[in-house]
């Protein structure tokens, strides 16, 4: 069964630039695991493992929500979730995502699918296993275009164990 989440994808050039910027922080914390550019995204809601049929139903139900997605958003603040040891890029105005997040969550619930009930925090995960107590860091601010929500599946390579995300169509 696929393990899925609803997300907003970023343009490839933005992902490449963010990954490059994040790698510059490797000298601060060489043990951190940095997110590959192809895996950068903005999670709107985590669903978990569902059937392939339900994944297709949810993917189709997300398509009409494009109209609720802001045209663009600014990436540029660095933050950490210390408990989870996550380094992230913050977004502003984060509240502009509330309508699409609320509707995505409502759609998931209406379809009778599981939904992670953690509160939404607008961020893009740049690294995991990030240590504590590092000096403040900055990213160049970028205003990036957004498209509508899509359903993504987590795929683990059986040979390498590496995770990648692919869109459920």
Residue ranges and their predicted role:
Residues 1-169:
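Histidine-dependent nucleotide/RNA phosphoesterase domain, centered on the 2H-phosphoesterase fold
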């Amino acid at each position: 069964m696929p393990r899925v989440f609803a997300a907003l994808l970023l343009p490839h050039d933005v992902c490449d630039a963010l990954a490059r910027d994040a790698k510059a922080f490797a000298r601060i914390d060489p043990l951190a695991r940095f997110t590959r550019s192809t895996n950068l995204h903005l999670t709107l809601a985590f669903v978990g493992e569902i059937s392939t049929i339900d994944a297709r139903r949810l993917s189709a139900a997300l398509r009409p929500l494009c109209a609720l997605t802001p045209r663009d958003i600014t990436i540029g603040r660095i933050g950490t979730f210390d408990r989870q040891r996550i380094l992230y890029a913050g977004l502003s105005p984060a509240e502009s995502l509330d309508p699409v997040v609320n509707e995505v969550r409502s759609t998931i619930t209406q379809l009778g699918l599981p939904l992670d009930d953690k509160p939404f925090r607008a961020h893009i995960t740049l690294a995991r296993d990030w240590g504590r107590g590092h000096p403040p860091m900055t990213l160049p601010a970028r205003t990036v275009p957004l498209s509508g929500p899509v359903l993504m599946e987590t795929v683990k390579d059986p040979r390498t164990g590496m995770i990648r995300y692919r869109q459920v169509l």
